[in-house]
């Protein structure tokens, strides 16, 4: 026979499970929010994935939260965080110069192309990758980590069993439907972004640096940020690729409440489809209105 005391202990233990497994209780109005997201997805003609974590009470809103989506440049957050992790024990690492050769340039290098035949520090490369989505900078971070597998290994080390990086820039953006390479799920990315920016996956100094870089992003004005009140502070990383893949992941500080973590992934069936940042903005607006 189970006593009331044992029952209380069981319920107390069960209450901790969402924090460990990421299956926190949903908002009471989640069904309505999900219906609005479904309508948005239907009207867009693509596939939408959304994950929200409200850190005030660990509630979540998920839409296709456990389906895989191509990450594209949102994977740059993991690479930069992995380098920051290395810097916890290698104190001068972020000041280490990295040579930029003409052959290093790929398809999008707004910062690195200014330093050809010169050097950039790992800190400068991280900022370029996160704030300008510079692909050469991303490749230099990947090389510092020993290849794409090194980025994935860091993800595993901080408890993310879903993230996988298989290629470098720009091929990691092919976003072929059904291809598991360079993918994650909205739920997994939201949990990891929370740990990196609000949790203890990084040391305090490194965490603050990552947040500063994300807040300084220059590529996200038309995505998640566009769907939120202008008074809210946002740190985000966008991504885009083939099949009209359009992504944004963000940490959000609303006025007068605890931070939110929001992941929005969107991809389409046509390889040459246009990106749809408006879909991400609409998803963010639906989430904000449902709080």
UniProtKB/Swiss-Prot annotation:
Leader sequence residues: 1-28
Taxonomic superkingdom: Bacteria
Primary subcellular site in the record, as a coarse category: secreted
GO cellular component: extracellular region
Keywords, ordered alphabetically: Antibiotic resistance, Hydrolase, Secreted, Signal
GO function terms (MF aspect): beta-lactamase activity
Record field: catalytic activity: a beta-lactam + H2O = a substituted beta-amino acid
Gene3D superfamilies in UniProt: DD-peptidase/beta-lactamase superfamily
BP GO annotations: beta-lactam antibiotic catabolic process; response to antibiotic
Catalytic machinery residues: 73
Family stated for the protein in its record: Belongs to the class-A beta-lactamase family.
Subunit structure and binding partners: Monomer.
UniProt protein name: Beta-lactamase CTX-M-14
Natural source organism: Escherichia coli
Lineage: Bacteria, Pseudomonadati, Pseudomonadota, Gammaproteobacteria, Enterobacterales
């Amino acid at each position: 026979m189970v006593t009331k005391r044992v029952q209380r202990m069981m319920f107390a233990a069960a209450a901790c499970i969402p924090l460990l497994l990421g299956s926190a209780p949903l908002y009471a109005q989640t069904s309505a929010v999900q219906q609005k997201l479904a309508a948005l997805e239907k009207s867009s003609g693509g596939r939408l994935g959304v994950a929200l974590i409200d850190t005030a009470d660990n509630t979540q809103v998920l839409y296709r939260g456990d389906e895989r989506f191509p990450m594209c440049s949102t994977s740059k957050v993991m690479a930069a965080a992995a380098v920051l992790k290395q810097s916890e024990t290698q104190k001068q690492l972020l000041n280490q110069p990295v040579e930029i050769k003409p052959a290093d340039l790929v398809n999008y290098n707004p910062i690195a192309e200014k330093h050809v035949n010169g050097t950039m520090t790992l800190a400068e490369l991280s900022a370029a990758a996160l704030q300008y989505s510079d692909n050469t900078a991303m490749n230099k971070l990947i090389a510092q980590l020993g290849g794409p597998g090194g980025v994935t290994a860091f993800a595993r080390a901080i408890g993310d069993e879903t993230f996988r990086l298989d290629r470098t820039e720009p091929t990691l953006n092919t976003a072929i439907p059904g291809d598991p390479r360079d993918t994650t799920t909205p739920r997994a990315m939201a949990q990891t972004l929370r740990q990196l920016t609000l949790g203890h996956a990084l040391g305090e100094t490194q965490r603050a640096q990552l947040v500063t870089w994300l807040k300084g992003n220059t590529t996200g004005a038309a995505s998640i940020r566009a769907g939120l009140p202008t008074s809210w502070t946002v740190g985000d990383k966008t991504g885009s690729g083939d099949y009209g893949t359009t992504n944004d992941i963000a940490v959000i500080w609303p006025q007068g409440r605890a931070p939110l973590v929001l992941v929005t992934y969107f991809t389409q069936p046509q390889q040459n489809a246009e990106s749809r940042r408006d879909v991400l903005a609409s998803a963010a607006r639906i989430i904000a209105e449902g709080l």
